[in-house]
């Protein structure tokens, strides 16, 4: 399952497409 609203992401729980966590992922990395 993918993450929808978490601020962190990893290979085990990747962000869902077009979700908030994906934006945070890019910002943090």
UniProtKB/Swiss-Prot annotation:
This protein's UniProt keywords: Disulfide bond, Ion channel impairing toxin, Knottin, Neurotoxin, Potassium channel impairing toxin, Secreted, Toxin, Voltage-gated potassium channel impairing toxin, Voltage-gated sodium channel impairing toxin
Tissue: Expressed by the venom gland.
Disulfide bond recorded as keyword: yes
GO cellular component, one term: extracellular region
Family indicated by similarity: Belongs to the phrixotoxin family.
Note from the entry: Negative results: does not inhibit the potassium channels Shaker-IR (with inactivation domain removed) and the rat Kv2.1/KCNB1.
Record note on domains: The presence of a 'disulfide through disulfide knot' structurally defines this protein as a knottin.
Protein name: Beta/kappa-theraphotoxin-Gi1a
Organism: Grammostola iheringi (Argentinean black tarantula)
């Amino acid at each position: 399952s993918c993450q929808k609203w978490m601020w962190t992401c990893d290979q085990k729980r990747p962000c869902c497409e077009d979700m908030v966590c994906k934006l945070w992922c890019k910002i943090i990395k």
